[in-house]
Every structure is written in structure tokens, then in C-alpha cells.
Amino acid sequence: MSPEALSELIFNIANTLVSEGKAGTLTADLIPPQAKFAVMRPKDRAHGDWASNAAMQLAKKAGMKPRDLAELFAAELTNADGIKSVEVAGPGFINITLDSASAAAVVDTVLEAGSDYGKNDHLSGKTLNLEFVSANPTGPIHIGGTRWAAVGDSMARVLEANGAKVVREYYFNDHGEQINRFAKSLVAAAHGEETPIDGYKGAYIDEIAKRVIDEANADGVDVLSLPRVDGGADQDGNPLGEGDSEQREEFRKRAVPMMFDEIQRSMKNFRVNFDVWFHENSLYSDGEVDQAIADLRARGDIFEKDGATWFESTKHGDDKDRVIIKSDGNYAYFAADIAYYRNKRHRETNPADVAIYMLGADHHGYIGRMMAMCEAFGDKPGENMQILIGQLVNVMKDGKAVRMSKRAGNVVTIDDLTDAIGVDASRYSLARTDYNSPVDIDLNLLSSHSNENPVYYVQYAHARSCNVDRNAAAAGITYEGADVSLLDTTADGEVLAALAQWPALLREAGDLRAPHRVAHYLEDLAATYHKWYNVERVVPMELTDPEARGEQADAIRIAKAPEPARAAARLKLNDAVKTVIAEGLDLLGVTAPDKM
């Protein structure tokens, strides 16, 4: 019997007690939803397999003492199939012990569902637009963007496991001043000049500049001989200033697609596949910025002051109104944000019911204006728009901060990280910490084969379970027809309980937008499995060296051979663990090796 089944049973008992007039002043409309009747694993196993505080939740509404109400629940629970015993403890806790068959039923449930175990459809019918990374195309993706890549894609997978339709989206900032500075930096590098004060540095700038020159030469264009004088306008219609004219535009139009290709390559190598690559410049070229402003104007949220056009965001909870068209006629950056949200909600293909923005810590000040804009369009902040703010990443090696990249200068890039520790360790280590908290990435630890390395510890549990399968096959042991009720030891019970908690954990991770909970669960399951493996054998091993210690002993230790029926049941439990670990790792975009 799973925790969810127990919650449902307790919910039904509450309604039964009301209908029979045994629950004092409690009425059916005062009973909370089933999900509110949480069933917990007691810290002290002497208190049973599961515990509920339902009586304490309802006692005040019933006008009864919690223990008295708990006794009524206990009497009903005792008669339920699969429950061995029930005890009321303390102020009104209900401690429940399952019979062995009921506790072990989760094994069959896992193996029948396979990689779908725990997945549900409670978010079905909703399209969630999840925008993440969205780094400027002015250089390689840095470590902060790398964290969002790991967290964002893992979050998307978790949401999909809960039935949501997820659109993974990357907003490509190919319009505005940062692109101008990027192009200026390339021109300076091409001429061997110093980087502009507000420009971009790093070996990649020299690389891109050379690629632009080579590509232009192949097209018959001598880019270095193009004018570098005043005159004309850039692709955004802005006047070209000194050092900004035709030559800079040639570098710009060739270099931005190069960076776009590099970013796409990095994301693919990191196992992140976006559904939409949205170009900011299209909002201007397609007239969507003007349409969005006109829409807000029609709603009474636009006014003119000091020669500029303003969004009256204070009407919707912002701390001040926002300029969207400056007095010089140029658009403020926020104008594109307005148009982009409107596009997400009303596009023809997969319009978003919920637009989720994953932003860096430096964007915290954007929340007020974004939520105000959402409300101005008639939507519900927090429901139709959700903003997640991530914190900083510190990369450490030999106890010291790593701040330099061979290619990108003073930042650590996605390729730097994956070259150092691989994609698996990179994704896992970045996703396992709540994005609301800073995270330290210890390169020494994450490249080690030790139990202190969390990704190694979890992957090793999967590899170990695969090895058990191979040894069992060699010994002729199968679990066909196995009686899981024989899984009745303390170690068995711990593994069974861990497996039973996966569906609720997965649902919670989706509702809370918290993929790090998946990683924490996997680490707990791996620890429980490793302990089980050390005390419960499936296949006996011969002792070839009585003096063996440590890892060597783990491979050759002798164990009493279990009877065939119990060996089969343990093999079945082993495979259930293997299934759930593989599923959890996949949700984090991490491989589940069968050998290590």
C-alpha cells in the first residue's frame, strides 16, 4: 500500500465518520482535499511504517480531543486490507504498520509501470512555456547560463512527467546595444586595436573576428576595407557613428549567426533541446513591439511625458512607471519584453497558459514591472506568469575559486565545465541544489570516484543493480513468479518505503518547480540501496581472501545463500530500484551506466 493509497483511505474514513455522526461538529465541507492528508515515514521505525496527523488536523473542527478522534481513525484503519496494526501515539499521531505483502506490492507496481512509474497527468491540459538560458549572443554561455540549462531542462522533464505540455524556449537577444558593442569589439580585434572600453574580451573575440574575415573573403568581400566613417544606419535604424558604419555592420551580420550556431551546439552537447529559438529582432521587424504598445494604450495603460512614452505600471503594483519609448525615439529594452510576453500568450502554435521566466540574480528588479505588464494584459501574475530567480555559481578547484577561461577571459563557460568533469557531473551538480541558493561546484570532488561525489554515488547504485542482474543470470536466478511478501527484513522495508515515496515526490517536484528534489530523492534511495546490498544477498559470493578489506571485500565477501524463493524476491526488488534510479537520472538529463 502506497502513501497515496493511505492518504485516500484516511480521507474516506474522515467522510465515513462524518456520515455516521461520530466526528462531533466536523462536516464534509470542512474536510480538506485528500492531498492534505500527508502520510509520513516515522524517524523511529518502532513507530510503524507510516504516520498520519489527520486527527490533529481535524480535531478543532470536530470539537474533539485529537487522541479521541485518532482512536476512531485507528479503529477503521485496523479493519482495512493490508494493514497489520495501528497505534495512537503522543497528542494524536496515528502510526500504521503494513503487512509484508502490502508493503512489498510497490515492487510489482514499479516493474509493471517501468519508466512511467510515478508519472501522472495532473498538469495535463496546460501548455507551459519555459524560457531559460537566453544568454546574449555576445560570447560563449557562462557558468550562470549553464546552471539554468541544467535546471531548466530538468524542470521541463519533471513537468512533462506530471502531464504538462512544455515548450522549451531560448530568447536570442539579437537586437540592441549589446550587439553593437559586440560588433565594435570584433572590428577592433580585426585591426589589432585595443578592446573598446565597454567591449567584450577573450580569445573567442579574436576567433570570431578571423572567421568573419575568412567567410567574407570567401564571398568576395574584403571586410577590412569597408568604410569605418559616419553615415547611414544600422539594421535597427539607428544612425551609424564614428567607427560604426559599414564595416561594423558587416561584422555584425556575419558574427551573430556564428555565435547563434555556437550556442546551439553547446546546448545540444549539454543534452538540452529547445523547441523554440526566438529572435528578439523579429519583434521589431514584424511590428509586434508597436502592436503590444497599441494594445496597452487601448487598455488605458500608456501615457506621454517629457517627450517619452510610458507604461503606467504603478496601476498594477510596480514601484514606478516605466519608459518604453525614450525621448530620442528609440525603444527601451522593456518594450521588447512587453511584446515578447504578448507573443507567448497569443502565438498560433502552442500559446502559453503559463509563461515561466528563469532569470539571473541580476534581474530581481525586473519582477515588479513584469508582473505589472502581465496584469495589464488582463492576465494573472503568479498564474499566467511565473518568474524564477537563480543565484550565483562558484567553481572551485584545489580549494580555490576558478574565475578564468582560456577562451572567454574572466568567466567560466559551459565548455570549460564539461571539459573538466563531463556532462553528467555538470548537469547533476547544477540541478541538485535549489536554484534559489548559491552553489559551489568542486571540480576535484565531482571528478572523483568516491561516495562523497553525489553523481557517482547515484550512478554507482544503478551500475551495482545491473551487476546483480548479471550475477543472478549467471547463477540461473530469475524473479518470474517471485513472492514479494518474502521481503520482510528491516533492510527490505527501508527500500520498499523509499520506492513508495517516488510518486508523491515527483508530483511535488513539478508543483514546486523543484527538480533538485529529484536529486535529493535519488541520493537517499541510493544510500538505502547500498545499505540493503551490504546485508541482503541475491547471489552468494565465495570468500577467496579472508583478509580482504574495503572495496575488495565488497567484491568477494561470503554470504549465506538465501533460499531460492527469497533470492527471487530480492532480485525483483533490485530491479525495481534499478528502474526508479534510471528514471530519476533521466529526468535530470544524466545517464544511468550499467557498469562503472
From Swiss-Prot:
Compartments, as annotated in UniProt: Cytoplasm
GO molecular function: arginine-tRNA ligase activity; ATP binding
GO biological process: arginyl-tRNA aminoacylation
Source superkingdom: Bacteria
Segments of this protein annotated with the region Disordered: 227-249
UniProt keyword annotations, A-Z: Aminoacyl-tRNA synthetase, ATP-binding, Cytoplasm, Ligase, Nucleotide-binding, Protein biosynthesis
Keyword Nucleotide-binding on entry: yes
Catalysed transformations (reactions): tRNA(Arg) + L-arginine + ATP = L-arginyl-tRNA(Arg) + AMP + diphosphate
UniProt cross-references to Pfam families, sorted A to Z: Arg_tRNA_synt_N (PF03485), DALR_1 (PF05746), tRNA-synt_1d (PF00750)
Disulfide bonds, paired cysteine numbers: none
Motif segment ('HIGH' region): 135-145
GO cellular component, one term: cytoplasm
Enzyme Commission numbers on file: 6.1.1.19
Matching NCBIfam families: argS
Subunit relationships: Monomer.
Stated family: Belongs to the class-I aminoacyl-tRNA synthetase family.
Name of the featured protein: Arginine--tRNA ligase
Species annotation: Bifidobacterium adolescentis (strain ATCC 15703 / DSM 20083 / NCTC 11814 / E194a)
Phylogenetic lineage: Bacteria, Bacillati, Actinomycetota, Actinomycetes, Bifidobacteriales
